[in-house]
């Protein structure tokens, strides 16, 4: 007979139904998993979503697959004729078929696919699927991704140089101002919502950009009701205001971004060391000293400047001597600022539906120092 403590228990763990991995307590009564509750003692266990709470239903659902099934009738037949097989047979059959395809058509003829780890229980398996794909010799990976995933993972790769992993936790605990742009963590990621709510109680300010006043937008200091599909106009306007009024960290831009690197006026590409001299390195980008006007090389491999970087210019046009003659260039930060100025504040407001007084007045009242 099983011990009563084994039949009734509260087991700490985490929810594996998405990449958030929220801390949980599994409730077992009479040997049956009956509930999944949040675990406040866990860093991400302040709350769990409806999908997590439905875990017992998934475990005991009558249609849950418990073992491999093999089709015994042709595709298109109303009755597939599923037949239970062993794991050994399933793995051997799959491996044999993959080897046949590789022998006949090459490994590149096979594509591997995986569900998004953000909304499924595959977050622990995705890296192994990719490892199998590369060991097999195929470059073809098809994955599903939510609309928000492209901005989070791919846009950050271009902005910061590295994609943000799905299970990342922003430093909401110490943030003075939080901006949620098209993001409702009450639905998408409860751990972010609870951390943001805690930050608001501490005194942090919240700005929400969303057509709908949903979730934490109801508690925001500033809600910008952008017209759907016009976010770019609002982003240009906000950037324009911040640059023109100096509401950004100048030192951070100089030190930690490519803002000082020179952009060629003739082709819009970054100026490189190979443009300056025949023996110059293509891995070297070029900035300009604000006080002397002399070029300062940046080594992208070493991740540092090769000269004095204390007063790099972030604005203005400079003429750089090249073997082909003088070439007009401007710092990347000024290049971006100029692009933002091409649309006036009034034009941007008319496009996105957010009043210019909100973009300027309310934003300035809530900017972070």
What kind of feature is each model-predicted range?
Residues 1-329, 334, 343-347, 355-358:
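N-terminal export/assembly segments and adjacent metallocofactor-ligating motifs
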Residues 340, 362, 366-369:
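A glycine-rich, hydrophobic/aromatic-adjacent loop/helix-cap motif
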């Amino acid at each position: 007979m099983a011990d009563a403590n084994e039949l009734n228990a509260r087991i700490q763990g985490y929810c594996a139904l998405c990449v958030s991995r929220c801390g949980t307590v599994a409730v077992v009564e009479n040997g049956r998993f009956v509930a999944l509750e949040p675990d406040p003692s866990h860093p991400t266990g302040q709350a769990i979503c409806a999908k997590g709470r439905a875990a017992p239903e998934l475990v005991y659902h009558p249609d849950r697959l418990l073992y491999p099934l093999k089709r015994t009738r042709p595709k298109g037949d109303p009755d597939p004729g599923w037949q239970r097989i062993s794991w050994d047979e399933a793995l051997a059959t799959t491996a044999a078929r993959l080897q046949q395809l590789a022998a006949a058509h090459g490994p590149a003829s096979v594509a591997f696919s995986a569900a998004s780890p953000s909304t499924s229980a595959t977050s622990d398996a995705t890296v192994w699927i990719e490892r199998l794909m590369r060991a097999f010799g195929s470059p073809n990976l098809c994955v599903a991704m939510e609309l928000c995933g492209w901005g989070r993972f791919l846009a950050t790769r271009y902005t910061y140089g590295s994609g943000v992993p799905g299970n990342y936790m922003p430093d909401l605990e110490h943030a003075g101002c939080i901006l949620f742009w098209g993001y409702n963590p009450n639905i998408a990621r409860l751990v972010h919502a609870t951390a943001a709510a805690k930050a608001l109680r501490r005194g942090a300010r919240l700005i929400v950009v969303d057509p709908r006043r949903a979730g934490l937008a109801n508690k925001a200091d500033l809600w910008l009701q952008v017209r759907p599909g016009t976010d770019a106009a609002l982003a240009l306007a906000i950037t324009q205001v911040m640059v023109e009024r100096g509401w950004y960290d100048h030192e951070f831009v100089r030190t930690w971004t490519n803002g000082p690197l020179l952009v060629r006026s003739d082709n819009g590409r970054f100026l490189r060391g190979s443009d300056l001299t025949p023996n110059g390195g293509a891995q070297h980008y070029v900035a300009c000293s604000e006080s002397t006007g002399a070029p300062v090389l940046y080594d992208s491999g070493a991740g540092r400047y090769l000269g004095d970087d204390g007063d790099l210019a972030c604005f203005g046009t400079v003429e750089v001597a090249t073997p082909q003659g003088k070439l007009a260039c401007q710092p990347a930060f000024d290049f971006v600022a100029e692009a933002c100025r091409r649309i006036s504040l009034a034009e941007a407001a008319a496009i996105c539906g957010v009043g210019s007084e909100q973009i300027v007045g309310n934003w300035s009242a809530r900017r972070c120092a």
